[in-house]
Amino acid sequence: TVAAFVAASLGLGLCADCTNLRAENGKIIATRPVNSGRDYADIISRTSPLLATVLCYSDTDGVIVSAGRGCDKQTATKLADKINAALCCSRAAVDEGKFPYACQVGLTGKAVAPDVYIALGISGAVQHVCGMENSGTVIAVNPDKSERIFDCADYGVTEKAENLL
């Protein structure tokens, strides 16, 4: 990438895919996913300045309906249309061909920060959660109550999304 080329050319460190940057004791601390997205780590650069790529919030719609592997496109679209919400999805839904990449939320997609985020059939992989973690209220709908999406949800419904409409 361009950022990696610039960092290498200048002999500087690069922290990619950051979800947060903050200053402490005169140092910049970058937070990013690690361990295949299962955890987060704070990175303190040994070089100055620090180069970083950061997930920017590209969607701040009032309400977003987001579909994962466990929800069909028709159900998600119907709900989004009914409540006048933006429609997004997880990487799994893109990989299955249900949605275009432009709809993908997460580390390899876009970051969103709506007032309300409705996750339909989304497991809650850290790669997805880091793209929606700054949402106001999170409502998770998934028949498997052990899915990680419930860990970051304000409200949870253990049911198939199709059964709610």
Where are these regions (language model features)?
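N-terminal glycine-rich FAD/FM-binding segment characteristic of electron-transfer flavoproteins
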Residues: T1-L165
